[in-house]
Amino acid sequence: SLLLSYQTILAHYIHGKPSSWKSLEKPKFICPVPGFDRHFRIFDDFDIEVITVPLIEDGVDLAKLKNVLDENQNVMGIICVPRHSNPSGEVYTDENINGIFSIGKAYSDKFLFLFDHAYLIHDFLPTKKQTPTWQLALNNDTNNQTVIVTSFSKVTFGGGGLSFLAADGDNLDLIKKTRLSMVICPDKINQQRHVDLFKNKEAIESHMTKHANLIRPKFETSYEILGSISDDYGTFSKPTGGYFITYKTSKPIASKVIELCSMLGVSLTPAGATFPNSNDPNNNIIRIAPTFIDEDELKIAMDVFITSVQVAHLGPVSYTHLTLPTNVAV
């Protein structure tokens, strides 16, 4: 889905109608934050300015989105992860997606709505229902402005799954035009492998249930350990699917926490990575990936993390008030 997202932006940059984006003065694109670092890199490659809008519980902050569009010219579109958003896990409501469509459409009938549905079927706990995004696009008469991408990269093998794209009108024509110059044909053997394994919807759902059973305990362990220290130190997201947790420190100490963890042998996503140019303006967002290691290692890593949060929060003072796990010493 990342490659299809890139090719969608490339298509508009080179062949966009009525004007290619490369011919415009200071084109811009909106990214909700905290967000996916690879999305930011796409726009860096094309020297497209990224404008951020905050995420709230139900999706994008619509008031901030409208303000951004009211104050800026040549905003070409918005990219969203509408289900289990990376890294904080928001699941957009239908009302929020409808609002995004309404505000963007009012700004321009060429405004691009790019949805990266990387975690479309990746629930591991009960998750709110969503109307299919393409149906919402049809309902809002924005199907000619909408591109939805997803893949099986996190279903079968990373980088080795099948990818899918939904688009219409000029968007579909532009993407096809660009891809036809790049790709002779898809990997048909890989397609056949997937068809042989996933013969129907039920087979896919059964497979994802197995994924959920592997992943859920790791998240529950993480929630328990993160919840063992006071909210005075920070708060954390509790996603019902996807692959990440976001920890928000109450002080601007994210970089210090990550440094302390690294000193103790725990590697985390670099500070600032969930913002454009790796610049977290408040230095307080940390992305946690519980799925990477086994559960025993995860418990140790999370103990290191909460200890590092407390040490960084308290600074050079006595640590008598720390909530310390038994296997971590300061």
Question: What is each PLM-predicted segment?
Answer:
Residues 137-216:
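Conserved core segment of the aminotransferase class I/II
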Residues 320-326:
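Conserved small/polar residues in nucleotide/adenosyl-binding loops
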Residues 77, 112, 147:
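Hydrophobic "anchor" residues on beta-strands that sit immediately upstream
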Residues 246-251, 268-302, 308:
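Conserved PLP-binding active-site segment of the aspartate aminotransferase-like
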Residues 117-118:
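Conserved Walker B
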